[in-house]
Design a protein with these regions (language model features):
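N-terminal cap/lid segment of alpha/beta-hydrolase-fold proteins
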Residues: 20-45
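Alpha/beta-hydrolase active-site loop
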Residues: 90-110, 129
Length: 297
């Protein structure tokens, strides 16, 4: 059997094992629009809610089958939910409203306000921004913690990285750079130099701001930031003109440094080697599960 076929078989079998735990799908309404979400419930009591936000273009099946953490969380009594939100580089108003409506419904249904937020790539950026939103708005929810995998957090840096990709790379990386530039300029009406306030207010973290921008709302939140900052891999496989400032690990490293200075000693920046660049697989599930159980107790 070829390696690719074997990988696909493992994913299919993993997902079918999750189906045995009854992956359910439902719909909600936000801003007059219907959204979908998918979830797995434990058979017994509900310890809390874990919302996992997928990366751009990632389907819920991939999230639930590719990370064994989801299965282990359900076994420990957590409800695991994967909503379908906009796959933007940041949390727009619609994404925030989707999460608000979803959370409101599930808190009422399960009778628990205990919440863990997690996400990968752009989903991690949305999860981070939503955590900040919950704190800034004093939402009556028990936010236990946040864990994210390689998200783009500082839109000022992301825009600059996009320009570098557009001007100095070829092929799909050049196209990605053009898409980043277009998406952010269309959303905010121009470049960071022209629309600094819009970029700062929509970023999860702004390294150039003394108060960290929205990151100041994370000072009391337990956080795990995961990344595999393999610049050699990036240069070899994507574009040899890319530098450290062009990868998302730059944001995570700077965010942890900022939060530690602010007194958040529960913010961990976890780097790996050989687990896969920009992948859910960066998370070691058993270790992460222990952390979630600890902060939820």
């Amino acid at each position: 059997m070829k390696p690719v076929q074997l990988i696909l078989l493992v994913i299919i079998l993993s997902f079918h094992s999750l189906l045995a735990q009854d992956v359910k799908s439902n719909k909600g309404n936000a801003n007059g629009k219907t959204f979908k979400y998918h979830y797995i419930e434990p058979s017994g009591g509900k310890k809390g809610i874990v919302i996992l936000l997928p990366g751009s273009g990632e389907r819920f099946q991939s999230v639930l089958s590719n990370i064994s953490l989801a299965k282990q969380l359900v076994a420990q009594g957590f409800v695991v939910i994967v909503p379908e939100v906009h796959t933007l580089l940041y949390a727009d108003e619609y994404s925030i409203n989707i999460l608000n409506e979803l959370l409101k419904a599930k808190v009422k249904e399960y009778g628990t306000k205990s919440l863990i937020l997690g996400g990968f790539s752009s989903g991690g950026a949305i999860a981070t921004r939503y955590a900040e939103y919950l704190v800034s708005k004093n939402v009556q929810i028990d936010l236990k913690g946040l864990f994210v995998v390689d998200p783009p957090l500082d839109l000022h840096r992301v825009y600059t990285a996009g320009i570098n990709m557009l001007q100095n790379c070829d092929g799909i990386i050049k196209k990605d750079g053009a898409n980043i530039k277009a998406q952010l300029e269309n959303a905010f009406g121009g470049s960071p130099a022209e629309k600094i306030e819009q970029y700062t207010s929509n970023s999860s973290f702004t390294a150039s701001s003394k108060d960290g921008g929205n990151a100041k709302f994370l000072i009391n939140v337990p956080i795990r930031l995961y990344s595999e900052p393999d610049l050699n891999f990036v240069k070899k496989n994507y574009c040899n003109k890319l530098e450290k400032a062009d990868i998302n690990a730059t944001d995570l490293e700077a965010l942890q440094e900022y939060l530690l200075k602010c007194g958040n000693n529960r913010c961990e920046y976890i780097t790996t080697s050989g687990r896969g660049f920009h992948s859910w697989n960066i998370i070691e599930p058993n270790n992460c599960l222990k952390w979630i159980i600890k902060i939820s107790s």
